Amino acid sequence: MILKSFFKNLKKDFNNKSFNGFEFNSKKIKKNYIFFAIQGSKFNGNNFINDAIKRGARIIVSNKFKTGINKGVLYIKVSDPRLALSSFANKYYNKKPNNIIAVTGTNGKSSIVNFYYQILKLNKKRVASIGTLGVKSNGVSLKLNNTTVDTITINKILANLKKKKIENVILEASSHGLH
């Protein structure tokens, strides 16, 4: 994939720069990946830029420029790396089911999602649910660590469901996981 599809206003020299994948966790970085340096609740991604570069990141997206810029590494400064990652993941995994219903609230999310899932299934619709119980669908079962997963994971799951011709998804959206 090439950068110009995802970032506007790049210098011409960088428009055709390619990448193999992207992550916000430096431990998951592989050769020629993009690293999104995100401020989390416990960690600041900017503190892991060097680790990401050592692991193979060649493009860094951050809200700060790192001093002592490494040769061969492109830095892209954005005001909100988390929002940039969400937009990036949404474009990268651009094919998703047509009908996505999100359920949020203090109590009852799992029950409501399960009810919707059963109703659609009884009506012979190809349906999946995502939430506390993981990902559930015809022939698809996947455990998840959190009720609401990160933006890369949710986009990847939705794209995979679309590949399996599932057009209806009901998901739990915890208020903590929304952005």
Each PLM stretch: what is its role?
Residues 1-87:
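N-terminal leader/targeting and accessory segments in enzymes
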